Curated annotation (Swiss-Prot):
Gene name of this polypeptide: rimM
Cellular component aspect of the GO annotation: cytoplasm; ribosome
Protein name: Ribosome maturation factor RimM
Listed NCBIfam families: 16S_RimM
SUPFAM superfamilies in the record: PRC-barrel domain (SSF50346), Translation proteins (SSF50447)
Length: 172
């Protein structure tokens, strides 16, 4: 079965079985909602078990979650450093113009027919995502995912077409 990374358990939270998760999910509210099924992987990326979310809340930059049947710190402390993943079957359907991070990371970015670089990371600083584009011999380009900049995303061909607005590329 194919799994996709959605977060890392970085610590426990209190004594009642809550865990502090650093999310790398594209849809954290959906991914960590009550009843969601996730898979737990150890620090060697080996499958441990399926888990069900019974509670979720945001606190600062973390998602605080609790698993079904794990209601005390002693039951969850061993999971610090483990990774949470979602199975491909549990990903859900997307609307037009929505993409999973794993679909975007690695895509080639072009302006007209000139290769700019490849998407290496996606940041969520505020109102819109920012795609970090790794370029040959230049600093990374921060590309806001907004309509005037990102013209098209071709998932099957792993290609993004953009129009760089003035001031976006400080090395040109």
């Amino acid at each position: 079965m194919e799994y996709f990374n959605v977060g890392k358990i970085v610590n426990t939270q209190g004594l009642q079985g809550e865990m502090r998760v650093l999310s790398v999910s594209d849809f954290a509210e959906e991914r960590f909602k009550k009843g969601s099924q996730l898979a737990l992987f150890d620090d060697k990326d080996q499958f441990v078990q399926e888990v069900t979310i019974v509670s979720h809340r945001k606190q600062k930059h973390f998602d605080i979650i609790k698993f079904k049947d794990m209601y005390h710190i002693n039951a969850i402390e061993k999971y610090k450093g483990y990774t949470l993943k979602v199975s491909k079957a549990n990903q859900g359907d997307l609307q037009e113009g929505e993409f999973y991070y794993h679909q975007i990371i690695g895509m080639a970015v072009y302006e007209k027919d000139r290769l700019i670089g490849y998407v290496k990371e996606i940041l969520q600083p505020g109102a819109n995502d920012v795609w970090v584009v790794k370029r040959q011999g230049k600093r990374d380009l921060l590309l806001p995912y907004i309509p005037p900049v990102v013209l098209s995303v071709d998932v099957p061909n792993k290609r993004v077409d953009v129009e760089l607005m003035e001031g976006l590329d400080d090395e040109d």
